[in-house]
Design a protein with these regions (language model features):
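Short S/T/G/P-rich N-terminal loop/turn motif that feeds into the first structured element of a domain
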Residues: 17-247
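Sec-dependent N-terminal signal peptides
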Residues: 3-12
């Protein structure tokens, strides 16, 4: 009995150590990325009009109330011909994501899709960890979103990097930073080799410039910046975004 109790005590200590190993509990959500090119004779205005059709179709389904939508177009990008637009759906949970997918597939979504003025070449499902959120947008603002492919360095994983990034973001916000940050983990539909995709975004275009200057003036070289390690990133792509609902 004494031996069994000792084992139970060791097991309990190990569990506590594992639970307390990380500083923060990530705030997660699910997102879908629909990437494509406009059909002949169609453009962004047509896609924005089609959003109106989608919004009207979705309003009585009961599963889209907590979904946010943004439509992004590439601006600083290494291959502008590869895509014209990216439609992004964000859901609070994966259950909400798949409840919406079920409604789409069984309540008329495929029929509505026939009028989409864009042909998707990639559809990617992801899970995201929120590190920080941007300033509240003002009416009419366009957002900026920068996606970068990242790899973990030896000895680091998602939870370790998340804690370091969260520490950095908290310090950055104390200095006036208003950048939204996410660690995105792509799954179905993704054929790249990144461990995660970093998203940096601001709720206005000029906000990105202000925050970049703030980084070099106040954040670069700080202890929080020096502690932000364990990963490296490449291939940044910058988009202009139109928040359509819930952003």
């Amino acid at each position: 009995m004494k031996y069994i109790l000792s084992l139970m005590l060791v097991f309990s200590i190990n569990l506590f150590t594992e639970d307390s190993e990380y500083k923060y509990e990530p705030e997660g959500n699910a997102a879908e990325y629909y990437i494509g090119n406009f059909n002949k004779g169609k453009d962004l205005d047509d896609l924005l009009k089609w959003y109106g059709k989608f919004s009207k179709w979705a309003e009585d389904k009961g599963v889209y109330d907590d979904m946010s939508v943004a439509i992004l177009t590439p601006y600083f990008h290494a291959d502008l011909a590869s895509m014209d637009a990216m439609w992004v759906n964000n859901f609070p949970t994966q259950s909400a994501q798949y409840a919406a997918l079920n409604a789409w597939m069984t309540q008329g979504g495929p029929e509505l899709l026939k009028s989409l003025p864009l042909t998707n070449s990639r559809q990617v499902s992801t899970f995201q960890w929120v590190i920080s959120t941007p300033a509240d947008p003002e009416e009419g603002d366009l957002m900026v979103a920068i996606y970068t492919d990242c790899k973990f360095e030896e000895g680091y994983d998602g939870r370790k990097v998340y804690d370091l990034y969260k520490d950095f973001a908290i310090y950055a916000q104390s200095q006036g930073d208003t950048v939204g940050r996410k660690m995105i983990f792509p799954s179905a539909g993704y054929d790249g080799d990144a461990d995660f995709v970093r998203l940096l975004y601001t709720s206005s275009i000029d906000g990105m410039g202000v925050n970049q200057e703030l980084y070099w003036d106040k954040l670069d070289g700080s202890e929080a910046s020096q502690n932000l390690k364990g990963f490296s990133c490449s291939n940044p792509r910058e988009y202009i975004g139109r928040p359509m609902r819930g952003m």
